[in-house]
Regions:
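Conserved alpha-helix/loop element of class I SAM-dependent methyltransferases that forms part
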Residues: 80-99
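Conserved SAM-binding loop of SAM-dependent methyltransferases across substrates and taxa
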Residues: 110-122
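Conserved SAM/SAH-binding beta-strand->alpha-helix loop
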Residues: 132
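Conserved SAM-binding loop
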Residues: 139-140
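Conserved SAM-binding strand-loop segment of SAM-dependent methyltransferases
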Residues: 147-158
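A short acidic, Gly/Pro-enriched loop at the edge of an enzyme's catalytic core
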Residues: 162-170
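Mobile active-site "lid"/loop adjacent to the S-adenosyl-L-methionine
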Residues: 173-213, 217
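Conserved beta-strand signature within the Rossmann-like core of class I S-adenosyl-L-methionine
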Residues: 198-203, 225-232
Length: 398
């Protein structure tokens, strides 16, 4: 099946589930008000807030409460483009690997994608597991309605999955790194993107996010030549590097080049991933990349600094991306006018400097969570950068 027909098949599947695609928040919430009763909307809002602030038990409660026939399609329509991004990619990998006969979908929820995979590959066996009993009940009911006999759903926590249940492919999408607010592992210092090889920082990340224990359990469920597809919210380098190190430490290697994926959540743009296809003892053709991804920072052309200006109030150059570090390193004859470096007890650093270079007066900001900023202006406008420098210092102290 071509990718176009696969996407169309998935659209039909999502429509069967009652999902709709929206690109406008206004249109989406209008549909929500038309579809759900005031009581259902109040329940949804209450559960969303409790999930945001609560524990693992609150998260299970959220999915139990929202697995109902009316709320589920409304809630999951927000993720319509996520399904379009992940569903065809996973389905394609299953189809191309004939050695994959048994597939385990961890954190399958109500089985929206799991049932799609089972429909597209009736000759393969699928098992979906989730901690939410209501989600599993809904998934089982929907699979029966679709007449699927090659998929089953079980209400299980990953930690309680019997180690005899081996699979040729384990799917883990948005399930391993559930601590969305965790900043990750800082770099060695503010002027590098490299992470130290210290096992203590890595172990602490794996422990506080729970990824270490989850990966250990997944690895135990993988057949000898099994594969794993992982897609998490680890786009930031400080989260991507420790995830990759956790995977590599458990003998998982890259089968193909990881893919960064962008999709919409109604009006919001989500940059997620990478999308990893992994295997035990994978070839050395692909290597883990611990460097920042290419960004949208403007190119630096010394010859065009002044000639390219169209607005006299604009800086000569401005970059708020990791690539700003490379430009800062290129500035000629730099010398500090002011500088401050703050170090936290946990080793994180923040550095800001106001300086003079051949190209002009600059302000440079960097920290160990890979944020970079560089602003360059003519010497006559140095007061603007001095004010900006002080604002940063005030924000640090507060």
């Amino acid at each position: 099946m071509t990718n176009g027909s696969l996407v169309q098949s998935l659209r039909s599947h999502l429509a069967w589930w009652g999902l709709k695609r929206f690109t406008s928040d206004e249109a989406y919430f209008q549909w929500q008000r038309e579809t759900l009763s005031p009581v259902e909307i109040a329940t949804l809002l209450r559960e969303v807030e409790q999930k945001r602030r609560g524990s693992s038990a609150d998260e299970v409660s959220f999915y139990d409460a929202t697995a109902g026939s009316n709320i589920l399609p409304v809630l999951h329509s927000q993720q319509y483009d996520y399904y379009l991004a992940i569903g065809p990619r996973v389905t394609d990998r299953i189809g191309k690997a004939r050695s994959i006969q048994s597939i385990l979908d961890v954190g399958c929820g109500a089985g929206i994608l799991t049932t799609f995979y089972a429909r597209e590959h009736p000759d393969r066996r699928f098992v979906g597991i989730d901690r939410s009993s209501a989600s599993i009940a809904r998934a089982t009911k929907q699979a029966q309605a679709l007449g699927l006999t090659n998929v089953q759903f079980e209400c299980l926590d990953l930690e309680h999955m019997p180690p005899t249940h081996f699979s040729d492919l384990v799917l883990a999408t948005h399930v391993l790194v559930q601590a969305e607010q965790d900043p990750g592992v800082p770099s060695r210092s503010w002027n590098t993107f490299e992470r130290a090889g210290e096992s203590e920082l890595q172990a602490d990340f794996e422990r506080r996010t729970g990824i270490g224990a989850r990966l250990d359990h997944l690895n135990a469920l993988l057949s000898a030549q099994g594969r794993m597809i992982v897609f998490e919210k680890t786009r930031q380098l400080a989260r991507r590097v420790p995830l990759q190190r956790a995977l590599a430490a458990r003998g998982l290697g890259l089968i193909e080049q990881p893919e960064l994926i962008r999709y919409r959540l109604v009006e919001e743009i989500a940059d997620d991933g990478p999308f990893y296809v992994l295997g035990r003892g994978a070839s050395r053709q692909f290597h883990w990349d611990d460097s920042p991804e290419p960004d949208e920072g403007p190119p630096f052309d010394r010859a065009k600094l002044k000639s390219g200006l169209t607005d006299p109030d604009e800086p000569l150059y401005e970059n708020h991306w990791p690539s700003a570090q490379h430009v800062w390193e290129q500035l000629r004859d730099k010398h500090f006018l002011k500088e401050t470096t703050k170090q936290e007890p946990d080793g994180r650093q923040l550095h800001v400097e106001l300086g003079q270079a051949e190209e002009g007066v600059y302000l440079y900001f960097a920290n160990t969570l890979d944020q970079r900023q560089l602003v360059l202006v003519e010497p006559a406008r140095m007061a603007m950068l001095e004010s900006y420098y002080q604002e940063i210092l005030d924000s640090i102290s507060s």
